[in-house]
A protein has these predicted regions:
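Membrane-interface "cap" regions at the ends of multi-pass membrane proteins
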Residues: 1-42, 46-51, 65-69, 81, ...
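Helix-loop-helix junctions that connect adjacent transmembrane segments
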Residues: 3, 9-15, 54, 127-131, ...
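C-terminal membrane-solvent junction of multi-pass transporters and transport-like membrane proteins
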Residues: 160-161, 331-342, 382-434, 461, ...
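Transmembrane helix-boundary motif of multi-pass solute transporters/channels
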Residues: 17-124, 219-220, 225-228, 235, ...
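A generic transmembrane alpha-helix motif of multi-pass inner-membrane proteins
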Residues: 180, 366-369, 373-381, 410-494
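TM-loop-TM module centered on a large, flexible mid-protein loop between adjacent transmembrane helices
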Residues: 86-88, 93, 125, 201, ...
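Hydrophobic transmembrane alpha-helices that form the core helical bundles
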Residues: 55-56, 65-148, 153, 173, ...
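Membrane-interface loop-to-helix entry segments
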Residues: 120, 133-190, 222-223, 246-250, ...
Length: 494
């Protein structure tokens, strides 16, 4: 039996296939390249040392590559919008599917709130006497309009937002390399720095342990690449676009992140790196670039808006997908004539605004708990993707299909998903071992238990209310027996 049939322009449920490979690639890059690279990378260098930071980011890149390979195979075989929890529904269980969707939605809703706050603060560099909340409100309106009007507009806006960040990184790497090899003078050196900072205090000045202690920060810095899977259901010709986006995205991320870290580490003594000043600004100022602070403020502002743009998109598609499955009110799955799930967008924006409000009125209680829970969501999603990949391939072969029938097959199976699962579990172990991160589990475990309890209680209540299984329960439990069958949001098989 053939794999999922791809409709050229319309996805089941009213969404439209309007995004192309360039949109997918830039959306994935835009979801990752943000304040983690522009601001927090200095912390990694300071803790792990120059070589240690590169090793940590190389390990993170490898994990991302493995996750994206698995996601690529799943997304081509089953190009669903809001894919993660639908894969979990098919190959793990409906309760897990619901929990994953809620965690991932919460992760981006909280991130969205923090991005709006950051945008307002960044604008105060140029307008110091204006209230930050005015700028935050303006950016909220802009991001909302970009998402509510059409998916094509979202894709185009994210393409250009991400392009600015990519251009800034390329310029940084090129200028940094010229300074490293003496083509451009740089303050603090009367000779070409080359790789002097890498070995002047020893290859690993703080030892091996900091590589692993910073690895968790690095892994979270790469979160957002999986947005490709969320957008699969709105992509033209996913069997061609998704594999291309997967490989180009991972390659560019590795070059951008590791290349940037290498340049920073070569030009900035590791003891001077930190989170107080962006390492990008330090390098640009060292070579005498005028308005370095303003230029990077603009780039970081663009990064923040890009992350907010992607955040609202991801949140709304998760809500739309949950509604299509009957897990939450189906009204939230309604789309307008442009194929945009307007109620899902509004619901997600409202959720992020509540998170933003909690950061003001309950920063040490409610908001702290939200941040703690959302912080581990990426690892949970990544691990679930790898588990689903293993089970998908097993069922595919068990049902008489061959690997050759797959339109895209991830290389290195089953090594790739197994190693990815081990790495995700290892990252969770690091959380337990790190006293500063351990408290996140105190919030995470009860929240996950609450999601499972709430889901099964809801199913039982609806079944009792209707005197049997209602459509929500059917939608969650009627998984197609043949994994090659197209998914139907009404819970029925074709």
């Amino acid at each position: 039996m053939a794999q999922s049939q791809e409709k050229p322009d319309v996805e089941q449920g009213g969404l439209e296939r309007k995004m192309e490979t360039r949109h997918l690639t830039m959306i994935s890059l835009g979801g990752v390249i943000g304040t983690g690279l522009f601001l927090s990378s200095g912390y990694t260098i300071h803790q792990a040392g120059p070589l240690g930071a590169i090793i940590a980011y190389a390990i993170g890149s490898l994990l991302v590559y493995f996750i994206m390979l698995s996601l690529g195979e799943l997304s081509v075989a089953m190009p669903y919008a809001g894919s993660f929890h639908l894969y979990a529904k098919r190959f793990i269980g409906p309760g897990t599917a619901f929990t994953i969707a809620v965690l991932y939605w919460l992760n981006w809703a909280v991130a969205l709130a923090s991005e709006f706050t950051a945008a307002g603060l960044l604008m105060q560099r140029w307008f110091p006497h204006s209230p930050a909340w005015i700028w935050s409100a303006a950016f909220i309106v802009v991001v909302f309009l970009l998402n509510i009007l059409s998916v094509r507009l979202y894709g185009e806006s994210e393409f250009w937002f991400a392009s600015i960040k990519v251009f800034a990184i390329i310029a940084f790497i090129v200028i940094g390399l010229l300074a490293m090899f003496g083509a451009i003078p740089i303050a603090g050196y009367d000779h070409a720095p080359m790789f002097e900072n890498f070995y002047s205090d020893g290859w690993l000045p703080n030892g091996v342990l900091p590589i692993f202690s910073t690895l968790l920060t690095v892994v979270f810095a790469f979160s957002g690449t999986e947005v490709v899977g969320v957008a699969a259901g709105e992509t033209k010709d996913p069997s061609k676009a998704i594999p291309k986006a997967v490989h180009t995205t991972v390659l560019r991320l590795a070059i951008f992140f590791i290349g940037s870290i290498a340049v920073m580490a070569a030009l900035i003594p590791w003891r001077k790196s930190g989170v107080d000043t962006s390492p990008f600004v330090l390098v640009f100022q060292s070579i005498g670039m005028p308005f370095a602070g303003d230029i990077m403020n603009f780039v970081v502002l663009t990064a923040v808006l890009s992350a907010a743009n992607s955040g609202l998109y991801v949140c709304s598609r998760m809500v739309w997908s949950l509604a299509q499955e009957g897990m939450i009110p189906r009204k939230l799955a309604k789309t307008n004539f442009h194929g945009v799930p307007v109620f899902a967008v509004m619901f997600s924006m409202a959720g992020s605004l509540l998170a933003l409000l909690s950061s003001v009125v309950a920063a040490s209680t409610v908001y702290l708990a939200l941040v703690a829970v959302s912080g581990l969501a990426t690892l949970v999603v990544w691990a679930s993707v790898s588990v689903c990949h293993l089970r998908f391939r097993h069922q595919w072969l068990a049902q008489g299909h061959t690997v050759g029938e797959l339109k895209y097959r991830a290389p290195g199976y089953p090594f790739v998903p197994i190693v990815a699962i081990v790495m995700c579990v290892g990252a969770l172990v690091l959380v337990i071992c790190d006293p500063s991160q351990r408290s996140t589990l105190l919030y995470m475990i009860p929240f996950v238990a609450l999601c499972y309890t709430g889901y099964y209680a809801s199913v039982a209540w609806r079944a009792k209310r209707h005197g049997g299984q209602d459509d929500a329960q059917n939608a969650l439990q009627s998984v197609p027996q043949d994994v090659s069958q197209p998914h139907r949001e009404d819970g029925q098989e074709d």
